[in-house]
Amino acid sequence: MLADILQEAEEKMKKAVEGLRRELASLRAGRANPALLEKVLVSYYGTPTPVNQLATVSSPEARLLVIQPWDRNILPEIEKAILKSDLGLTPSSDGTVIRITIPQLTEERRSELVKVARKKAEEFRVMVRNARREANDKLKASEKNKEASEDEVKRAQEKVQKTTDNYIQIIDKILATKEAEIMEV
């Protein structure tokens, strides 16, 4: 019973860390990364579809993205979707592929991106803390229902706290890495 509660809390914390990694991968840090375009949706036969499901997205150089659609007819739609997105990128097409040159980030834009990264990290820290709170509530309920002794619950709560501290530390490391990547000129 207690092991299940601990396992469930840890799984939720792992999901929070993975979610943060995905979110931060979509933040532009001056270098081309195909993950930048993951949230760009293209109207494909009336259905919003992610770019990476309509084309091959590659990064042959540090500041260049190349999008090679499987269907050439969708090329103009992909261009429109990229222009409409809030990424601030300008695509150029030669009829077969779309090239996007990633501009150098200004100091102001870098500090904005760092703020966004910190905000996202805090959202995921809150998710980890919520997982801890839920686990502690379940542990207290199991003590109240006489399913576990007070000592067992205390030990389990200490384990939950250690796990929480560990995942918060992981989030902080991920954030520090992303901040360094953003501020790198």
Curated annotation (Swiss-Prot):
Locations listed in the record: Cytoplasm
Name of the protein described by the UniProt record: Ribosome-recycling factor
HAMAP family tied to this protein: RRF
GO biological process, one term: translational termination
GO cellular component: cytoplasm
Domain of life according to the entry: Bacteria
Assigned protein family: Belongs to the RRF family.
Region spans: Disordered: 135-159
Gene: frr
InterPro entries in UniProt: Ribosome_recyc_fac (IPR002661), Ribosome_recyc_fac_dom (IPR023584), RRF_sf (IPR036191)
Known function: Responsible for the release of ribosomes from messenger RNA at the termination of protein biosynthesis. May increase the efficiency of translation by recycling ribosomes from one round of translation to another.
Species the sequence originates in: Moorella thermoacetica (strain ATCC 39073 / JCM 9320)
UniProt keyword list: Cytoplasm, Protein biosynthesis
Major location category of this protein: cytoplasm
GO molecular function: ribosomal large subunit binding
